[in-house]
Amino acid sequence: MSAAQPIFSKGENCKQVWHDANADYNAADTHLEIMGKPVMERWETPYMHSLATVAASKGGRVLEIGFGMAIAATKVESFPIEEHWIIECNDGVFQRLQEWAKSQPHKVVPLKGLWEEVAPTLPDNHFDGILYDTYPLSEETWHTHQFNFIKAHAHRMLKPGGVLTYCNLTSWGELLKNKYDNIDKMFQETQVPHLLEAGFKKEKISTTLMDISPPSECKYYSFNKMITPTIIKE
């Protein structure tokens, strides 16, 4: 495998066809690919659990954007929450979500569509926790799609005292390969300015690090640490 092959080619955009594209879960259920893109891999589990723990830390009503392999979602369900709303746009993944929802301990509200379509229909001050982990759908938004959601919706949809956590591993893996060797510095320089623009306060943004060992064949992440943000709305 050529390590130099970028995840997105210049100008590439999958958005129009993503919802109909096959969700390719491998037989062992350790990898999910859509349109040949490495969307989710089972080795991410400890990190996904870290994000889920933050998102569910206030209890109440949790919104998750992106269902993937249900790694974070299943962890969210293990906490004493009340409702679990999940936005997912891919048909095959959404079918999995509907099936999974039937056996969960808390009320699950599956919402089908791109977050750009669904989020505007959701009310202000509605969620105690939000976990945003979706796959970038174009080269143009590869490094920035999370900020579009956070600025337009995350801040307004959180209740005061509510918590946001998120990741963009496809972006961060690239930044840590080519631009940064310090994950804290990467987060402070490339993420925090956008969070402040969205209306969050610097003193309400904290992060924790964890050691991780991505498999050598992983196409999107090779750094030995991951970072979990905790962002509280005042």
Curated annotation (Swiss-Prot):
Stretches assigned to the RMT2 domain: 1-234
A Gene Ontology molecular function term of the record: guanidinoacetate N-methyltransferase activity
Domain of life: Eukaryota
InterPro entries, sorted: GuanidinoAc_N-MeTrfase, RMT2/GAMT_Mtase, RMT2_dom, SAM-dependent_MTases_sf
Residue stretches spanning the membrane: none
EC annotation from Swiss-Prot or TrEMBL: 2.1.1.2
Top EC group: transferase
Catalytic activity line of the entry: guanidinoacetate + S-adenosyl-L-methionine = creatine + S-adenosyl-L-homocysteine + H(+)
Chain positions recorded as S-adenosyl-L-methionine binding sites: 18, 48, 67-72, 88-90, 115-116, 133
Tagged with keyword Methyltransferase: yes
Pathway membership, UniProt: Amine and polyamine biosynthesis; creatine biosynthesis; creatine from L-arginine and glycine: step 2/2
Keywords noted in UniProt: Methyltransferase, S-adenosyl-L-methionine, Transferase
GO biological process: creatine biosynthetic process; methylation
GO cellular component, one term: nucleus
Cited CDD domains: AdoMet_MTases (cd02440)
Residues involved in guanidinoacetate binding: 40, 44, 133, 169-170
Family listed: Belongs to the class I-like SAM-binding methyltransferase superfamily. RMT2 methyltransferase family.
Assembly with partners or alone: Monomer.
Its biological purpose: Converts guanidinoacetate to creatine, using S-adenosylmethionine as the methyl donor. Important in nervous system development.
Identification of the protein by name: Guanidinoacetate N-methyltransferase
Native source species: Danio rerio
